[in-house]
C-alpha cells in the first residue's frame, strides 16, 4: 500500500474539479498524452474513464473504473494498464484554511513486470511512492496557480 498527502490552499470543490475534469488532468499528470472525455452521464460509480499515457518510453492506454465517489470528498478508481492493475483513492479533507488531499494506492504487477517484481520490489515501491508524492505537488501547483 502506498500513501502520500499534501495541503492545498483551495476549497475541496476546486480540488475535486482538478482531480476529475479531463481538461485539468495533464496539468498534474504529465505522463498523460491524451485524456479521454467523460462518458455519457458524467462521472459516477461504475463509469469508465481513460487516458493515453506515455512513460518510460512506452505509450499505452489506461482504463479507469470509478469504484467509489462522493463529490468534493473522495474518488477511487480501479486502474488497468499493460504492466499493472491498481486501486487508487483520493480523500479530500477540509484542513483549517487549506484542504488536505490524501492519496492511497495498491498495485498488482502483470505481464513481464510480474515475473520481475520479486527482484525489483524495493525499487518499484520507491518509484511509485515518489511518483505519488510528485503528482500531488503538481496538483497543488496547478490548483493554486490556475485563475
Label each PLM-derived region with a short phrase.
Residues 18, 28, 59, 85, ...:
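Alpha-helix N-cap/helix-start motif
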Residues 78-130, 134:
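Beta-strand/loop substructures that line and gate deep hydrophobic ligand-binding cavities in soluble
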